[in-house]
Amino acid sequence: MSSKPRIHILGTGGTIANITGNYISAADFVPIDALLDLAPEEVTSHAELSLTEVTHLNSGALTPEVWFDLQNEIMQRSSSNNPPDGFVITHGSNTSEETAYFLNLVLKTEIPVVVTAAQRNIGKLGTEGFKNLYDA
């Protein structure tokens, strides 16, 4: 049995998953599995990771429907026979606090949920996205 924590990452897009510097279409964002493929090994090797791509949008385009999708995904996985030790949501920084507040109100789980974001996209020198993902 592995001693690594089992973390489920839910991708929603945002700057942390943006590679082009444009925020016009879904093509400007990389899916969560591709984001982790680009990440340094230190980011992905300290935990057993599983992934769900919820959406990949600019956070200003996220709607309450996406919030409910996140809630449903987290609650379904939390109540499974083998729930993760924690959840990490990759998100755009513009509206991450709204999503976090909504989830704080509606989630009925003791499993930690962390929302993380970035100010510089992964295509830029000095991006903090991978460090933020690691810290989450």
Question: Model regions: which residues?
Answer:
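Active-site histidine-anchored catalytic micro-motif
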Residues: 1-135
